[in-house]
């Protein structure tokens, strides 16, 4: 028997939902920093910059200080896309969830366990679907770090898929960042396929190698449900 239940969002959930959403996004910052550090262009820069300083000044101490500040800068840059995304959402769709989702032909669900909100997911119709398609987009899938491994994320995705079927949608689409490997594994296990990359026009995101990967699943096919 499941130790949680999935239900539609209610106004009393707002603070817990926002807290879970914010922490769920920001927890990816350390992984983003590690990902950025291992990029070939980052490794080259971390090698070349201190070497240039040593050759120009002869000071190894200055080179070490340079590496230290470069690492601090990279840590800051790696966190920016996630912090900016949270700030944007808190001022837009997450500011009034009822208006943004429940009153806009979409829906927002929470997973509840022990009287606490431990998971969230949302869905909205795609405004400009391809000709002949009726698409639903999945947003904000997140599960509390203390409640993972119980199948909650998969159950939330199934809820979106069932909603899409019931409402006559032909596809469910979503985007997730290259950093979120666990999410990508989950989506692919449930029948979603990668459809492309979304490279945003941002110098910071280019520097840290950040981009989004698009997924979709078409009905009637869907595994893991």
From Swiss-Prot:
Name of this protein: Probable N-acetyltransferase family 8 member 5
Any one GO CC term of the record: membrane
EC code(s) of this entry: 2.3.1.-
Bilayer topology annotation: Multi-pass membrane protein
Function: May play a role in regulation of gastrulation.
Keywords attached to this entry: Acyltransferase, Developmental protein, Gastrulation, Membrane, Transferase, Transmembrane, Transmembrane helix
Lineage: Eukaryota, Metazoa, Chordata, Craniata, Vertebrata
Protein localization: Membrane
Domain of life, source organism: Eukaryota
Similarity comment: family membership: Belongs to the camello family.
TM spans (from-to): 29-49, 53-73, 202-222
Occurrences of domain N-acetyltransferase (ranges): 69-213
Gene Ontology MF term list: N-acetyltransferase activity
GO BP terms, alphabetized: determination of left/right symmetry; gastrulation with mouth forming second; heart development
Chief location category: membrane
Keyword presence, Repeat: no
Entry-linked InterPro entries: Acyl_CoA_acyltransferase (IPR016181), GNAT_dom (IPR000182), NAT_camello-type (IPR050769)
SUPFAM superfamilies linked: Acyl-CoA N-acyltransferases (Nat)
Class of the enzyme per the UniProt entry, highest EC level: transferase
């Amino acid at each position: 028997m499941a130790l949680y239940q999935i239900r539609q969002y209610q106004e009393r959930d707002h603070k817990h939902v926002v807290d879970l959403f914010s922490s769920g996004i920001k927890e990816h910052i350390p992984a983003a920093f590690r990902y950025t550090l291992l990029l070939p262009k980052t490794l080259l820069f971390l090698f070349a910059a201190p070497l240039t300083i040593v050759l120009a000044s002869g000071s190894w101490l200055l080179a070490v200080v340079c590496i230290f500040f470069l690492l601090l800068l990279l840590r800051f840059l790696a966190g920016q896309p996630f912090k900016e995304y949270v700030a944007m959402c808190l001022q837009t769709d997450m500011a009034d969830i009822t208006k943004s989702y429940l009153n806009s032909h979409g829906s927002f669900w929470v997973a509840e366990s022990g009287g606490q909100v431990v998971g969230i997911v949302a869905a909205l119709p795609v405004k400009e679907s391809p000709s002949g398609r009726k698409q639903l987009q999945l947003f904000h899938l997140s599960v509390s770090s203390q409640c993972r491994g119980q199948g909650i994320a998969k159950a939330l995705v199934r809820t979106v898929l069932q909603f899409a079927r019931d409402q006559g949608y032909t596809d469910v689409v979503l985007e997730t960042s290259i950093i979120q490997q666990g999410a990508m594994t989950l989506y692919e296990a449930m029948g979603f396929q990668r459809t492309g990359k979304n490279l945003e026009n941002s110098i910071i995101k280019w520097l840290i190698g950040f981009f989004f990967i698009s997924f979709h699943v078409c009905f009637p096919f869907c595994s893991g449900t």
